[in-house]
Amino acid sequence: MKTNIKHHKKSIRPQAIFVLAIILIIIVIVFAQIFFAPVWLNRFGERLTHPFTSVVNVKELAVTTDTDGDGIDDASDLVDGARLEVKNHTTYRSNYYIGGYPPDDEGVCSDLVWRAFKNAGYDLKSMVDDDIAANSGLYPLTDDKPDPNIDFRRVNDLNVFFPRHAETLTLELKARDADNLALWQRGDIVVTKRGSSWHIAMLSDKRNIDGVPYVIHNAGPFPTEVDCLEKWAANGRIVGHFRWEY
């Protein structure tokens, strides 16, 4: 006697598919937040959570200087150079290098800055080294013993250099205030301090819905372009805001 055995395939319920899709989306968003510049995610989230909030438009600073003669103004070149660090996925690694420069695929927050300047046609290392050599007493970390292998990569030193050679700007940030936000422009340099920890970053040419610029920086594990400037300001972490004198 033969027994007929029917094999029934279990069908996946629509609810399960929906839950799996939500989980997958969350994983993708978290992954992007950690490893990539989540500008598009931030903007999508803003429109999703504030569908009726108007976008604050901020007048962009006009810059005509083109130091490297590539047809792109210096401020835009700085931003492009900083953004290249994000694109290149530079690994955050803090080491001492003979000659000063780390490998192209390594760096810390200050390396993003000098690379951005290099993209605009400036040799930030030489400028910092020359200023320290001529004014070592102004740079506490050097202790009258300049070290070109590391000085230009120390945020403490850059926080002395930029007030001397760039325009010092406001530390006050007001979201949705177009006049105040016009003082925060692409290519601006921002220095923060939290306890004894220093950090340096560059402002993006992109802004959030409230008109606040995004920040391009390397705080590890890789460089990112993120919406964190308002948080820094609210926490009192911003101790320097500079603009190169184009």
Where would I find each of the regions flagged by the language model?
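N-terminal intrinsically disordered, acidic low-complexity segments at the extreme N-terminus
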Residues: M1-T3
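N-terminal Sec-pathway targeting helices
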Residues: I5-I27
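Hydrophobic alpha-helical membrane-insertion segments, chiefly the h-region
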Residues: I26-F36
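N-terminal capping segments
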Residues: P38-F162
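Bacterial peptidoglycan biogenesis and beta-lactam-recognition machinery
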Residues: N119-L124, K193, R207-D210, A233
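...with weaker cross-activation on analogous glycine-rich loops/strands in unrelated enzymes
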Residues: A133-P221
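Low-complexity, Gly/Ser/Thr/Pro-rich intrinsically disordered linker/tail segments
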Residues: D210-Y246
